[in-house]
Amino acid sequence: MDKNQLGVQYMQEGKWEEAAKIFNEIIEENPNDPIAYINFGNVLSAVGDDEKALKFYQKAIELDENTAAAYYSAGTIYFSLDQFDKAKNMFEQAMKKGLHTSDNYFMLGLTLVQLDQGKFALPYLQRSVELNEEDAEARFQYGLCLAQLELIDEAIVQFEKCIELDEEHTDAMYNLGVSYAFKEKADKALEMFDKVLEIQPDHLLAGHAKKLIESAK
């Protein structure tokens, strides 16, 4: 096992200090290795030092402007800091450099949603789901985007698939209930709101929606 692999293994085990030590050694031995800078940045990000992590990602990009993973990692930090324009730029750069993963499509789609560009987000969220059909959260966000664009029938399909993958995804259940209500299927909507409240009794939106439908009956 080479040092990079060992460092990644330490990260997977949550041994951040050991991982940082290994990646620091790699950088000292080979200061032109962009992968080591990305990995060190990932350690810093994991322990909450986003500002320093960004510097390591920028260094990796300086060493090799085609290091797609550095753009992606920087994008995730900008997203978490609500700097969505910068995040969008980073995810787009990662894509241009060849990072066509479900995660990158998902994060770019999510970023565009935050920028109120749902119509542009839709194909990226769709591609994310196509690349990883078992990702419940991607299904949910794709469904949400469809619903916001009033593509209710398509949204229902995604919410249902999300719940198949994660039987306790209350957000998907709630939004499925809202979609059914929108389609004037009150009984199906109530069934969903009841399921939400069974799992999460303090779900205020589901409780309110249930009362609204019951009072309209």
What does each model-found stretch correspond to?
Residues M1-G7, K185-K217:
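Terminal, low-structured helical/coil segments at or just beyond the last alpha-helical repeat
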Residues Q12-N24, V47-K59, L81-M95, Q114-R127, ...:
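Structural signature of tandem alpha-helical TPR/SEL1-like repeats
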Residues P34-I35, A68-A69, T101-D103, A136-E137, ...:
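Helix-start (N-cap) detector for alpha-helical repeat units in TPR-like alpha-solenoids
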